[in-house]
Amino acid sequence: MAISKERKDQIIKEFATHEGDTGSTQVQVAVLTADINELNDHLRTHKHDYHSQRGLMKKIGHRRNLLAYLRRTDLPAYRELIQKLGLRR
């Protein structure tokens, strides 16, 4: 269910704002989005896994808060990130 270390490193490299960046808001949102997508796939096959469903809801809430923060502080970066991740239509 969790994303692999290789996939996580790939996401970090893609969304990092500078060398060694692992904690910027953009990186955190991208990693959470990958986790959320993995959990969604898991829950499609295991519909009654309520423990994982709760974890999914917590991750979605965390991502929502990070996106709200990014929108408040850096609107162009927010727009670029949601376009890159395909979160809004």
From Swiss-Prot:
Keywords: Ribonucleoprotein, Ribosomal protein, RNA-binding, rRNA-binding. One of its GO terms (cellular component) is cytosolic small ribosomal subunit. InterPro entries: Ribosomal_uS15, Ribosomal_uS15_bac-type, uS15_NS1_RNA-bd_sf. CDD domains: S15_NS1_EPRS_RNA-bind. GO terms for biological process: translation. One of its GO terms (molecular function) is rRNA binding. Belongs to the universal ribosomal protein uS15 family. HAMAP family: Ribosomal_uS15_B (MF_01343_B). PANTHER family: RIBOSOMAL PROTEIN S15, BACTERIAL AND ORGANELLAR, SMALL RIBOSOMAL SUBUNIT PROTEIN US15M. One of the primary rRNA binding proteins, it binds directly to 16S rRNA where it helps nucleate assembly of the platform of the 30S subunit by binding and bridging several RNA helices of the 16S rRNA. Part of the 30S ribosomal subunit. Forms a bridge to the 50S subunit in the 70S ribosome, contacting the 23S rRNA. This is Small ribosomal subunit protein uS15. The lineage of its organism: Bacteria, Bacillati, Bacillota, Bacilli, Lactobacillales.
